């Protein structure tokens, strides 16, 4: 019995390790996408380039994104219109950088574990 439990514990630890590695990879992908969004100017009504980025990001990961003008959306795997639906909604445009901004607003920078750049803690982070 002890050897079975050890095998189960070992398999559970391996499975958890794989989940953590997958989560780490997803976090890295999300941060990289946010960096790309920060580096791409996207003022209101001029966000076609960030819409392109979001559409490509979703498509490269196997989603079937749709787009109307600069609005991008995708349905989760297993979506069933007959079942209750949860809509996650955000925007990907930014305001004009303020004159008092102390950094290059379009140069994503990580310092002390924090990501700086225009839109990094606004809806850009929510989109990602």
Language-model features and meaning:
Residues 17-118:
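Acidic/His- and Gly-rich active-site-bordering loop/insert found
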């Amino acid at each position: 019995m002890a050897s079975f439990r050890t095998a189960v514990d070992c398999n559970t630890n391996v499975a958890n390790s794989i989940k953590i590695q997958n989560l780490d990879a997803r976090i890295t992908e999300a941060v990289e996408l946010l960096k790309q969004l920060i580096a791409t100017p996207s003022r209101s009504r001029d966000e076609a380039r960030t819409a392109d980025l979001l559409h490509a990001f979703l498509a490269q990961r196997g989603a079937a994104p749709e787009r109307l003008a600069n609005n991008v959306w995708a349905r989760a795997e297993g979506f069933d219109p007959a079942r209750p639906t949860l809509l996650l909604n955000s925007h990907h445009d930014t305001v004009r950088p303020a004159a008092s901004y102390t950094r290059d607003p379009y140069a994503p920078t990580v310092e002390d574990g924090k990501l700086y750049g225009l839109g990094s803690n606004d809806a850009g982070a929510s989109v990602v």
